[in-house]
Amino acid sequence: FGFMFAADAHVKAATDDLFALSIKEQEFQKNEAFTGVELVHDTHRLALMNAMLHGIESPIYLGDTLSSFGKDFRGYDIVLTNPPFGTKKGGERATRDDFTYPTSNKQLNFLQHIYRSLNTNGKARAAVVLPDNVLFADGDGEKIRRDLMEKCNLHTILRLPTGIFYAQGVKTNVLFFTRGTQDTGNTREIWFYDLRSDMPSFGKTNPLKESHFDEFVACYASGDLSARHETWSEDNPNGRWRRYTYEEILARDKTSLDITWMKSGSDTDDYTLTELLEQIKTKSTSIANAVAALEELLGEVDE
């Protein structure tokens, strides 16, 4: 719920702690502006407590958005989220009957939920943190990417440095898109910013700072596509900001959005001993969790 609290702080900073708003607007901002959903009971309680401490009384529901419960969440103006990674418990598919492409991949299901939940007035937008596999998964993954680009203007993809959102080694991206008024023909070009290639290793001794995003923010141009200019060119092949047309994307194998072009350096870095130990611990935990999930799945099959 960090995005929710950060958004609330941003609004309050811009409105003199809401005092610049009318009474009606203040009530809306406090009681209706946000909506949250959490699956886990304990995390839900923490979210409610945190919201109370921030003066937010908007609803935070306990439930599974990938079940029929999530069908009612529609008409939103802005969605900011980093959905959980992995597969549905036991490997089953989502139980939403309104998903065109139900899959056991949580991220792909959440992506469908998100773009379906946006208002269709042509202004509703989303920024979603997703792992690399969403960009290149075949089968339903390709179909969902095509569906996203039809229903929404997927205008920007930010490749994040490795391991900053989740465990070390997990590669993530931020997808920025706006829902169209029609269900077809909304994406005409996609702008990519590569903040991963040829970057230093970030961690406790070298934290990622807001200043690392300065060039991206300038290139993003507040979402004004007409004001954007590539920093990449044939003369500057290591420019981090590059545009691809919709036709170029469709011509790629499996309509893959996993695009890199920078040649110098690599995604691999030199790590300190402490950072290597942290990675080993994290990967050991991930392996243990995967084994536990597999054992659970096998147990269900045996039953």
Description of each model-found segment:
Residues 70-303:
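A conserved structural/catalytic subdomain of Rossmann-like adenosyl-cofactor enzymes
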Residues 1-81, 86-88, 97, 104, ...:
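Conserved S-adenosyl-L-methionine
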